[in-house]
């Protein structure tokens, strides 16, 4: 099963920056991802999403984690998903 979740980036002991990735459930947080589908910076409140890639994985049955679900909901990705179906 594939999940959409956050992968921590940046230097140790610094403000965290995250990539939103599609990854197998059995992999660890920093493991090899299937594809990078977005970027999230909670300090600057910046978000970049590759919406076509996210929609592809959601249509194939990928499950977002709680935080990623909130980010996608705020960006309006789920309304686009319902429009495509």
UniProtKB/Swiss-Prot annotation:
InterPro entries: Ribosomal_bS16, Ribosomal_bS16_CS, Ribosomal_bS16_dom_sf. Transmembrane segments: none annotated. Keywords: Chloroplast, Plastid, Ribonucleoprotein, Ribosomal protein. It is found in: Plastid, Chloroplast. The keyword Disulfide bond does not apply. It comes from the Eukaryota. GO terms for biological process: translation. Its main location: plastid. GO terms for cellular component: chloroplast; ribonucleoprotein complex; ribosome. One of its GO terms (molecular function) is structural constituent of ribosome. Belongs to the bacterial ribosomal protein bS16 family. This is Small ribosomal subunit protein bS16c. The lineage of its organism: Eukaryota, Viridiplantae, Streptophyta, Embryophyta, Tracheophyta. The gene is rps16.
